[in-house]
Amino acid sequence: MNEILTLVTFLALLFYTGIEMKFQLQMLQQNSYRNDRYNRWLKGESFASVSRLTDLFLLLLLSTNFLPTFVQIVTITVVLAKSVKGLQTKYKKPLVFTKRATRLYIAVLLLSLLVAGLAAGLTTLSNGSRALLAIAILAPYFMMTANIIMQPVEKRINRKYYDEAKQILSQMQDLTVIGITGSYGKTSTKHYLYRILCERYNVLMTPGSFNTPMGVIRTIREQMKPYHNIFICEMGAKQIGDIKEICDLVAPQIGIITAVGEQHLESFKTIGNVQRTKFELVDALPGSGLAVINNDFPYIANRPVENVPVKRYTIADTGADYHIEDIRYDTDATRFTVVGGGERIELSTKLIGECNLSNLMAAVITARHLQVPVPSIQYGVSRIEQVEHRLNMKRTPGGISIIDDAFNSNPDGARMALDVLRRMTQGKRIIITPGMIELGEKQVEYNYLLGKQIAEVCDYVMVVGRYNSCLLYTSPSPRDAHES
């Protein structure tokens, strides 16, 4: 009986270790498989969490001779319960088992089995169980070790994929490549531009948030066809050189910068580094190309561009090349006029908020440069659907209006979302938010400012989690505040 219980304990801990490694792989994937970024994320997590302290307590019990049968039963029960909870937890950005993720997961499991197997084979199965629990506790470090071991393999595979993507692009003689980057707004702008250009061209865009070099390479290898005229390539970055790496691959002729703001400051450190990185796209453009950049942001407006023709756009500054006039929010649509290039283009859209109108303007400017007729642009804009979790308006059967802007948050985007909420004059205005993250040393400052802005607009606020609970104490204006 004891031998069976010991075996079941070992298997339960093996299963639990696999679940824990899956979560760590998810976090590593979200940090671009880079140990340095993943390690920065780890520093923001408490080692003394309830879950980890529970594991440490179980390890202590398993290391003693105190009621061994009872301890094993408790261990099995606890780790299986935690495993089930781990499997049932839903994440905004779940793990995607790409080929690379699968290889790394297998590698870290083999590494874990090797250590546990040595402990069990050289001593006893009970020691193997203790080793597995210790591995689960130290899962982040096993994950980083496995990642280091797999680096030579991944570099060789990535080089092969890179060369294949380059070869495909070299065969697309008439392809126009449009790069889009920005601290925020790039994914929405990509979708809007795609919808408009499809009125005239065969267009391929990077799907979802595929904005890393490997995401771009995968799109080219798997989806690019000889009949494509235009490739819209979203370009993300968390450090200097990231945009240049993608530009070296795809060689864009047109570049759009939607924003330069204080986001990802944990990795960029300064707003100057953000500006430098985003403008790697403009710097990569040929003299015959075009840069379309948003002058509503000071770090774009004050950056000279000399290597390529440029069109600067703003919401309201009539001194820019393009701006917007006559904004009207009707019950069923937003109506506005894009003014610039000697034209006044009247448009109607289902989208709400000035940030969306700004992104639409960038798409319209680019479409006109590519000779898309005005009627086609007007039709395309009218058919654009809201992008999920990006200032997306929903209405419930009970008459509640929900503005879903949950994809991420940043100082400027949050301010614009609150401005949309401010314009809703009927009913109570309620905000649910975890605050803003990845702002480095300005984390507290900007969340404090967000709290003040919320107090001016909202009747109720619910702060999700404790990380940015400072939002609760910025002003007494919200009549009710709740932290969960």
Where are these regions (language model features)?
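Single conserved hydrophobic/aromatic residue that forms the stacking wall/gate
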Residues: 473-484
